[in-house]
């Protein structure tokens, strides 16, 4: 079963954990050299950040690619090339999950709710956001469903609009909820350092 396959790869990955500023930071190193870093709220175990880093063909470490979490604010000192040109007025896309849903927020979208259309494209395995006034178009996948090899279902998709922000929710299939719960049990077994015990690779 695919869900077990992904969970198994997390179980067998080399893991280090650090408790810092109310967050549990976990660094995974996979046998193929890929790295994943996650940050969880210490009290709720809610996922706050997930990012990936892959080695280049020449063996050099690439940049961290954010999958879940708030993009680094402008002027944060660690700007990626894609953030340098970003204006405060441009739509800002980010993913912030809840316990039961994958959730994305697109800030700086001032149009009323009835202008937006959010749908699943089964063929391309992605979600498409478009506006009737043709001012905005966005296509994005749900890597978690790809990793678990689960289908996308229109019935699990919903969206809301408030304060110039479009909030898109996709209810997590039960297989994902179970796998995430199993992972939390697994992470409890990882020896966790505290921020004053030394550094962690996720820093």
Curated annotation (Swiss-Prot):
Belongs to the DPCD family. It comes from Homo sapiens (Human). One of its GO terms (biological process) is third ventricle development. PANTHER family: PROTEIN DPCD (PTHR31921:SF1). Highly expressed in the testis. Weakly expressed in pancreas, skeletal muscle and heart. Expression increases during ciliated cell differentiation. The gene is DPCD. It comes from the Eukaryota. GO terms for cellular component: extracellular region; nucleus. This is Protein DPCD. Disulfide bonds: none annotated. May play a role in the formation or function of ciliated cells.
């Amino acid at each position: 079963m695919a869900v077990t396959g992904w969970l198994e790869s997390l179980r067998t990955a080399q893991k280090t954990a650090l408790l810092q500023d109310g967050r549990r930071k976990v660094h995974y190193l996979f046998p193929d050299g890929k790295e994943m870093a996650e940050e969880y709220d210490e009290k709720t175990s809610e996922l706050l950040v997930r990012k990936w880093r892959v080695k280049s063909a020449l063996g050099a470490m690439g940049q961290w690619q954010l999958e879940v979490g708030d993009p680094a604010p402008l002027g944060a000192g660690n700007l990626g090339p894609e953030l340098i040109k970003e204006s405060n007025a441009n739509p800002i896309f980010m993913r912030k999950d809840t316990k039961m849903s994958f959730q994305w927020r697109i800030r700086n979208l001032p149009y009323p709710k009835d202008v937006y259309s959010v749908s699943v494209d089964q063929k391309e395995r992605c979600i498409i956001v478009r506006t009737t006034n043709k001012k905005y178009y966005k296509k994005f996948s749900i890597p978690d469903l790809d990793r678990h090899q689960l289908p996308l279902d229109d019935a699990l998709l919903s969206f809301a609009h408030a304060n110039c922000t479009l909030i898109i929710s996709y209810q997590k299939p039960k297989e994902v909820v179970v796998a995430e719960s199993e992972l939390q049990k697994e992470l409890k077994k990882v020896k966790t350092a505290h921020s004053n015990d030394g550094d962690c690779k996720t820093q």
